Each structure stands twice: as C-alpha cells, then as structure tokens.
C-alpha cells in the first residue's frame, strides 16, 4: 500500500508515516515519525481541519500541549490534550503550513517548561485577540517549580465512600486520607466545561466506575473512576464513584479570560474541610476567590469515559436559564429594545430557534466545545449575502415556523432547508439577498426537505456574547436561551462589505448544480444527488479506523444507515446492522472534531455535531468533510444515509 501525505508530510489515518499500514513494521525507518525520548510519535490528519499526534505517556502529552498552547502557530484555533494524544485544530485552508509548524513546536518541547521559539515574532498578529487570549490563557507549566497549585476543600461524605473502602480493603477514613495525600495534575479537560481529568490518584483507590450510572451527580461532587480523579462542575448524570463534595466553583462563564478554575498543567491538592471554604490558588500572586456555591442546574451529558452514556440527548433544565446569557433578560428589556428601530421582534417560533455564530475558539482544553452553526458553510454563505463578517451571529431555525418583524429596513438572506418564505405575502427565494422594509414581517413555512434554515440580517444578531461567542451550546448550557415569541433581538454592526445584489434567477433552477450543496445546503438537491432516497455523506478515514474488523471496515463505506429520533446538535445517531470492533480493548479518551464518526460498544455509529463533547472514549473511524457536514446538518429522523469514505 502506498501512503498519501499532505504538504506537511502527515499520513492519512490508518497509515504509518512510512506508508505501511498501522501496526506493521516499516522497512523505511528514515521516513518514520521521529523518535523523541526513545518513543515514536505518530501524526495523522483528522478530517479537513485537524491533526492528531499519538504520544507515549501523559507527561509527554503535558509537554506537547503546553508548548502548543503557549505558542500556537498562525491558523491554529484549538489545542486539545487528552490521555495519550494531542489534537490540534485550525483552518482547513493552509493546514499544511500550520500543521508543519505545530509538529516542529511539539517535537522541540524538550522539557516541562521549555517552549521552543518556532513561531515568527508577528504570529500573534495573525490571530484574533479573542483566539490569542484563549489559546494562551492555559499556558502554565505542568510541574514544579513555580507551577500553579490549586487547593480544593472537600467534605468526605460521598455516597460511594463506603463502597470504595470495601473495594480497596480500607476504612472510610483511610480512603479520605489517601485521597488527600495525592498530588494531582490536570491532564486534560473532558466532557463538560470545567471538568478536569486529574492524574496522580493513589493506586489503592483505582476502582471501576459504577455498573449503572446515576441519573444525577450533584455539582461539586468529588469523584474517582479508574486512574482519574475529578470534581463535577455542574449537576449531570455520571458513573464515577463519589467520595465527597466541595463548594468550590469549578467553572464560571462570566470570567472570559479564565472561565475554568483548573487548566491542563495545574497541580491540585484536596484538603479536608468541615465548613464552607473557597478554593485558593497560589502562583506567586494573590487571587480573588472564584466563588462559593455553584449555581443550580442540570445538563443531560456524560463524561467521555462514561461510555454507557456518551453523547446523550441533551436537555437544559429550567433552572439552567439563570446561567444562560439570554438574548433578552426581562420583559422590561424587551420593551426598551422595541423602542429602537434596529431590532428583530419574534412573533412566533417553530420547534426550535437558536442564535448561532462561528462558535467558541481556544477553550477546548478546559472542556468548552466550539458549538456554532450546525453548518459552518451555510453560516458563511448567509453572512456573505448580506455583507456581514463571516462569523456574525444568525438565527438557526429547525423545521421552520419562525415569524419575525423588522424594526428598520434591512437586508436579509435565508440559506438551508427547502421551505416557503414570505415577506408581507411576497415570496422570498432561498440563497438570495432580499430587502426587508421597516415594519415588514417574515414568515417561514415548514420545509419540504431538510431540517435547518439560517436567517442572516445585515449587521448580525447582537446577542450578548458568552466566552467570546453568541452561540447557543445545548450540551454546555452556554449562550442565549432558545428564542420565544415576544423576544426582541438587537441588530449589530458586524459589517464587512455590501450586500450582494440580487440577480434574476430561474426559481426552478435554484441549486441545480452540484456545488450548490456546499454553497447553500439546499436540501432538495441533496436528495436528488443521493442514491434513490439515500443521502451520501462524504468522509475521510478516521484515526482509529483500524479498530474495526476487516468486514466492518469494508462495510462502513457501503452500509445504509437510518437517522434515529434521538439525534440533535450534539450528535446524529445512526441505526443499522452493527459494526464489529477488531478487539475489546478500551481506547483512552482523545479529542473530537465536528463530523467525527464514533463507534460505541453497540456498533451503531454516532456522528458528532457542533455541540459535541470535547473528548470521547470510542474509536473515531471516519470524519465528514465540509460537504458531508453540510448534508448532515439537514438530516431528519428517518432519513437514510451512507458514508462515502475517500
């Protein structure tokens, strides 16, 4: 087999750098990835916009992650350390340049505190201020001397303390004492914002997860599972063993520069407490307390290691609304906004309408997903049509039904599902710039095909940003609440040019070329291009495709799957004859990307959407291309799809 490499010299997934299949020895050692510290590092392309490096141990992960977060090359937007890998995400355009630079930096990280000078001095000028701050905010040396040390007070009265004592052959007090005696380090962020996987657990306390996960673990629960320790930032289902509780706030989205108390590289000490004490951090300077009580709330989500619950359907509870940065806080605020002209008044919604933009960048290392529009191409297209910046906030409408009134004359554009739309009774074409007069009303019908429609208005939707983005993240309960009748949305000034002039168009021919799928996400076209009523999802091989047996690997590219009813923005779930893993060996958690196709134990693929967890513990066997992601965003329950892996 002959390997294909991009210009960065990185092999396709499933192939060694020398061109041999994974797990087979190379006959050309000079082409292998370089040996660092006596161990081979394996680099692979992941999808259109990421690279993954396999590393020998958690210490190497810490060094590489630290070096890349401290000096990210231009074009890199996120660095995601995990158990034995580091995933680097960046721009799809020019990946060979930033991937080569990232590889040089990573392979030059010779020690815990060494950051090689491998990026041009003006590199920071190529990143937005928000991305630069996020990417460098976690650049902390992982070990002594001078490491940041965080003390977390714990009341040891957990529901599983007695069971852990029994499994370990210890008393309850001995379990608590051994937990306190540990010296922990943050290895990586996990399934939800602020959830940090801590290494350094006493081997005597290494116990299995619960056979049946709890439906609710309270915020502040101090827990262990396998070789890791952690603190739950928010209430959630989970299968870890609970030793105690803390009142320490682990994650606060109001702190833009450092929303998570713990970042990779931090050292953690648990101290016994019998009264409320806030966390202390020592890094050579006094710090204000982070807070004392985590706000109430629950998100239906799971740790990446809790495989029985991975990528669950997510629902935000009513109490979470206090955490969400809602578009409009009060009826009085609505009335005040309505008195101005540059607003959109929501008269009615269909099943779901969200505010979305390009998402949150640079925060994956502390468990914050990127989120953003379900179809990034549609977001850019809609914004281009009205002369906005590519990342301006739009409305993402699920199954139509939206009715809005414009307070001032503006330009709008609709992109996505095939549906009827009218402004004051006059038809509106999908994928075209349209003038909306002051006081006019836009009504969206139910789509004949497809699922999502994006509405862009000139200037963008000016919802309050949370952690640098106006996007609603249903997994993490970040960003604006779903829209409701009566909401009034301010229009911003995210301009970048003039609206595109509407051209005469043959309505029947709209989206009649293959490029229209990628350009506008036209849903009718997707079905016409499919095989009968099977929608083809273009994809590339995933980094763990070799974890399938030979028959399943071959079947992966021809199997027709059915989209299930529990699909959402977190993941598209597929049903069909299950795939078979080549072995039952557990896979350490590693970073995920939009469009990653993961195969859990039941063998039925899960295709991750924009609100996916940051890390996952199942093999990623394929990754959708940009065109595949566009088509995925339009899939309804019952649709039939096939992965076209190239």
Segments predicted by a language model, with ranges:
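Conserved "landmark" site that anchors the functional core of diverse proteins
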Residues: 2-14, 20, 24, 28-646
